[in-house]
Amino acid sequence: MLRRMNFSVFAVMTFAGLFGWLTVSGQLVDGFAQDTKSQPASTAATQLPMPDPAFKGRIGETYKDSTPSYPLPVKASKGSPNVLVILLDDVGFGMCSTFGGPVPTPHMDKLANNGLKYTRFHTTALCSPTRAALLAGRNHHSCGTGVIIEMGTGYPGYTGIIPKSTALVSEMLRDHGYATGMFGKWHNTPEPDISPAGPFDRWPTGLGFDYFYGFNQGETHQYYPTIYRNTSWVPQPKSPEQGYHFTADMTDEAIAWTRNIRAADPDKPWFNYFSTSGVHAPHHAPNEWREKLVGKFDHGWDKQRELTHATQIEMGIVPKGTMLTPRPKEISAWEDQPADAKKVYCRLMENYAAYMAYTDHEVGRLIESLRTSGELDNTLVMYVVGDNGASAEGGLEGTFSEIASLMGVQLGLESSLKRIDEIGGPTSEPHVPVGWAWAMDAPFQWTKQVASHFGGTRNPMVVHWPKGIQSKGQLRTQFHHVIDVVPTILEACKIPEPKTVNGIPQKPIEGTSMVYSFDNPKAKDRRTTQYFELATNRAIYHDGWVACSKYGLPWETAGRGDGFLKASWELYHVNEDFSQASNLAAKEPAKLKELQAKFLEEAKKYGVFPLDPRFSERMDPKLRIAGDPKTSWIYYGNSVWLPEPIGPQLFPRPHSIAAEIVMPKGGAEGVIVCAGAFSAGWSLYVKDGKPNFRYTFFDIADVTIAGSDNLPEGKVILKTEFTPDGTREGGGTLKMIVNGILAGEGKLKRSAFRHGLEPFEVGRDSITAVSPDYKTPFAFTGTIEKVAFELTKK
């Protein structure tokens, strides 16, 4: 009887569970007429993702007397606009023709003539911080991104890790029914996470983007990029000789993505974050675009600033009476440059400008595709013209290889002059000299990195949305910041700010919507306070005034010391002094003191402390490694591909490489292991039966060490041992050993812990060849059983 009763209860409970007869407490209810009410829309809409919809049908005993209610995906409100956020890179306020600059940008002009031009819009002065703030709607320190991700340290404002409490607009839009895609430069994934093992929650696809096509790091070679599709590396679709350039490639991808979204769902709005490489170094422009600008900058950087300033006043971009700030004493006058220097500097600037003009062309292609499809009218375009000011990181002379500069190597004017005809092409990695960067930031002081002055932080913006904005071709002068983009998008799309995302309470959005200014040019500013800070360059804007303190030079990225605590402060009444030209600190000490106190208040509020002037010193990967750093690595097989920072960090430390390979009958050839690129890198390979080790270092310390004999058939242990000589240049002796017998030896004059933009690989050299002895991919045709690396104590 007991068994029968238990079975009966079990049967009733099972049947009741199927049809919903029981409450949580176990009481029977009338499940055949249930209609559970969903949460109020206002609550559900602020909890992302939204809760599963309640069942609204009717369940009877059989399907014939039941009414289904299929759960549908969240849909955006009818008529919701598409959103296109375009972000350029390292573009100064005075570069583009749209804002009075010398570089022709007709597609940006066209968009602005049918939209709005914001001339008091601001960024953070550096890449990753601006990008995090742009997408999160919070200040860069609130997003853990007080510096670029490669410089993250263990403080909340500087981790280089966007917290889960600051969800991105991509997550908000996706969870409200938008398709989301990201194309181009990301630069917000912590460097240790950029690997096949992830974790992937900090990649674009883990932060709200359905689709990603681009690169994770701060820059890439435009002819030989390191591209990811979602979370997987993909080879470029064609070669530079076939016309390949990454800017065109990412544009093709973005156009195809929007067309496929529309083909699959005619009503689904999309969010496209289109973040170009242009015009971050290396500056790569197709030859036909360079040819268009030959001779355009022969007058030099001083004259160019004067011309730009005059055009800006004539166009109304800057108010009448705006002063042109003088050249800093640290930058030489154009007239003092030697003839050969002028020749090189003009070529570098022509190439830089051509890169901008070409980028405008590709952005225009994307815009025209939307015009053709009829989608442009209801697409909110927010076109941010630079993530910071123009870059002075090319140094006073510019450079043929900015990768060399990043590694602390100044190739000098002679190197650029020798290879002047290659500038802008696939064999170059060029960057303009400081003087041209300063000229492109007219009328302001300073450049990228300098968050204290508008040359680093004031980037113009174009807004275009025919269906949502009546005004056309007008200026907007309200003071705004990159954190204001997200609340603007949310208001335009009628989406509430989320309170929780994935169960995590959210920090309030710190930006202010700009929608109020769309059709009201005289609207009173709604952003009255904004702090700025980057590597101790700091400023505070409050009610039309700016107090600021600059420290260090942006092209000197090491050894800045701690003098920032004694650095002087300046004061500007920027409501009347557009260009920060008249320092009022001595005349208005009370106002300066008031603003200094305001900066401290904002800095404490948003996690700016501790201040840290170090720049290149913070690039040390050991600052971001938990536990003891690795001293040995083993990789198996013929196919390993890793970003170089994730692979073994060998040079200039003492180390050994031991490859266990099998040479088939008749021999084999190919790359066993390599890291880096054509300009700098190392490769251990077999050619014509003999082992070779190549170290390439910007044509100034290249060396190939070849083995004396052919490798024997069968199993071979091929080993290299490097012993540093203790010099600052990282030179040393490298021995090549085959099956325990010395087979070759040579000297490396220089070496470095990192070699640019290309990966570490076992079994091939996929992108550009480290050695001129072979062409990519030069895959090894024998068998690689394993390759072991060890840091030694010699």
Stretches found by the model and what they are:
Residues 17, 28-570, 578-597, 611, ...:
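Formylglycine-dependent sulfatase
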Residues 575-579, 740-741:
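Asp-box/BNR beta-propeller loop motif
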Residues 588, 592-603, 783-794:
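Extended recognition patches within non-cytosolic domains
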Residues 10-27:
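Bacterial N-terminal signal peptides
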Residues 140, 576, 792-794:
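Acidic glycine-/aspartate-rich tracts in secreted/extracellular proteins
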Residues 610, 614-794:
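Extracellular glycan-associated modules
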Residues 1-7:
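N-terminal secretory signal peptides that target proteins for export/translocation
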